[in-house]
Each structure stands twice: as structure tokens, then as C-alpha cells.
Amino acid sequence: MHDKKVEEEILSLFNNEKTKKEGFTLLVNHFKKSIYFQIRRIVISHENTDDVVQEVFIKCWNKLNTFNGKSKLSTWIYRVAYNEAIQWIRKNKKEHHLNISEIQTEKQPTNNIFHKDAEEISILLEKAVLQLPEKQKITFQLKYFEDLTYKEIQLITGGSIGGLKANYHYAVTKIEKILSRD
């Protein structure tokens, strides 16, 4: 089913008291995977990600009736997820350390990126992204992994399009430097 149709169906079902639970179930089933991975890239650990995802869907249940339709429903939900992830990081700043060792490589790294398989490259990319400043990391993740437009990222993060483009450019440059060292 096309995303726009799904979003319309979710809102239609959710805004009717008799079908509200069905609409919410459809919302969760439709968005849980993408929301999980969006938050996981920010929060890192699986357990903490699960907690934040749960908070996102609780907030969606409580606030979906305030959705005004000025953006796509997916953009609104990504904004809720982004805000919850950032709130979790701020609340747990002392415990939330950049822990690159959490991402394990199974093979010994080689010095030439062209001799690495896709899994190794993916792990190296994840490690490189973890080393970015927060704004660059989030902008890169939303643009590269989620394939969102700058306008959609702006609606989620509240940043200016020019600032987002700069963050993405600096992120790509830093990632290239990091990957060329490995």
C-alpha cells in the first residue's frame, strides 16, 4: 500500500473512537522498523533504543490527535522520535559515551578499503558516523540512511536547510577522512 494511503488510513482509523486502537496498531506496524533504526543510530544500544521507541509510540498515542496535517504523518512521527532520542541523550549524557568498541568487526581490518567486504565497510561506516558531532551525525543519518530530503530533515530537526547542507557536507568529509585512515 502506498505510504500516503497508509497515512490517510491511519489517521482516519485513529480519529474514530471505535477504530482508534486499530489505527494505532497500523501506525505501530507501519513505522516501528524505521523508527527503531532512526533512534538506534542516535542512541546506539538496543536496550535503550527499545525504551525510546516505546516512549515515541506512547507520545504518538497521546498526541496524534494534535497532528495538523501541515507535513506528512511520517515526518511528524520522525520528529517525535528525534526529539525523544535527543531528550534521552540529554537525560543520560553521563552514561551515554561514544563507545566504538560496541561495534565489533569479525575480521582483521585491511589497510585498503577496496579489499573489504560489504559487511566490513558497513561496520567501518557506523564507527565513522559515531565519531561525528551530534548535529552532523543526525543530519548524515537522516540524509544517507533514511534518504530524507533536506526539507524533511528541516521539519524533523528544526535546523535551516543551509545549515543541514553544511552539516551533511562536513559529515561526509570527516567520514571520508576516517575511512581513508582505516
Each model region followed by its residue ranges:
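Short amphipathic alpha-helical boundary/capping segments
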Residues: 9-16, 124-132
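Internal acidic/polar
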Residues: 3-7, 95-122, 149
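DNA-recognition helix of helix-turn-helix
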Residues: 86, 136, 142, 151, ...
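Structural recognition of an alpha-helix C-terminal capping motif at a helix-to-coil junction
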Residues: 51-58, 71-83
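Short helix-capping/turn signature of helix-turn-helix
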Residues: 30-33, 41-44, 141-148
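Short, charged helix-capping/linker segments at alpha-helix termini
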Residues: 17-26, 36-55, 161, 181-182
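Arg/Lys-rich amphipathic alpha helix in sigma70-family domain 2
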Residues: 66-68, 79-99
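N-terminal module of bacterial RNA polymerase sigma factors
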Residues: 1-33, 152, 181
